[in-house]
Swiss-Prot record:
The keyword Methyltransferase does not apply. It comes from Streptococcus pneumoniae serotype 4 (strain ATCC BAA-334 / TIGR4). GO terms for cellular component: cytosolic large ribosomal subunit. InterPro entries: Ribosomal_protein_uL29, Ribosomal_uL29, Ribosomal_uL29_CS, Ribosomal_uL29_sf. It comes from the Bacteria. Belongs to the universal ribosomal protein uL29 family. This is Large ribosomal subunit protein uL29. It holds the Pfam family Ribosomal_L29. PANTHER family: 60S RIBOSOMAL PROTEIN L35/50S RIBOSOMAL PROTEIN L29 (PTHR10916), LARGE RIBOSOMAL SUBUNIT PROTEIN UL29C (PTHR10916:SF0). Keywords: Ribonucleoprotein, Ribosomal protein.
């Protein structure tokens, strides 16, 4: 993600409720699990997607902690 995309993503996250953030986090965790499984079996083509999903999860957790 480019810097502008990251800023847009975080801005969007800050507009969501805690429940919506938790839902989005769970979706990304499922995607991360699937990506790790693909990587382990040698089927993953976009290896950078792993890093991107991890960072998105971290951003969601950061926004959640800011709201507390």
């Amino acid at each position: 993600m480019k810097l502008n995309e990251v800023k847009e993503f975080v801005k969007e996250l800050r507009g969501l409720s805690q429940e919506e953030l938790a839902k989005r986090e769970n979706e990304l965790k499922k995607e991360l699990f699937e990506l790790r499984f693909q990587a382990a079996t040698g089927q993953l083509e976009q290896t950078a997607r792993l890093k991107e999903v991890k960072k998105q999860i971290a951003r969601i957790k950061t926004v959640q902690s800011e709201a507390k």
